[in-house]
C-alpha cells in the first residue's frame, strides 16, 4: 500500500512538473485593451462564475454561486459599442455553503429549476468609457424577462498559454430585484435586492 501511495505521489509530482514546465514565464493576460482581437468569443466555463449575495435577517450578506455558464461575446475594438453578449446560466448549478439551503433554492418555492432550468442574458446596448462599460440587456429568469444593466470592467487580454488563441476577461456587477422575476419567498427576511458579481473568461472561437 505504501509503495502504491509513493508511486502515485511521484507520478503526481512529475505531472505537476511537466505542467509547470509548459507554463509561460510571465502572465499572458495584460490589462491593455490594445491586445483585444476582434471576433466572436466563447465563454470559458471553468473560469467563469456568477456570484450573488442577499442580506439575511438584516444581519449580514449571505453569498452563493452559479457555475457552468455558457455563451458568446462579439467584440470589435474599432467599434466597442457594437459588442454583443449572450449568456446562458444553468440555474441548477446554484451553490451555497449550506446543503439544505442549496437544495431548497432549487425547489418550487424559489427558483423551481425543474421547470426553469436556465436563465439567459442578452445585451441590447453597450456604452463604453475607457476600460469600463455599461451593458444594457434583457434577463430571463424564472420564466420572466426584464431589462437590467451590468457595469463591466475590462481585466485583461492576451493569447491563452494552452490553446494559443486570443483570450479576454472581464468582471461585472449588477443589482436586481428577485420579486421582479416572481421569486418573492422570504421577503423581507431575505432581501428582495440581489447583488450580482460576475467574473468571466472568454476564448476566441
Tell me the role of every PLM-derived stretch:
Residues 1-4:
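Positively charged n-region of N-terminal signal peptides that target proteins for export
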Residues 7-17:
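Bacterial N-terminal signal peptides
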Residues 20-205:
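Low-complexity, acidic/polar, glycine-enriched regions of mature
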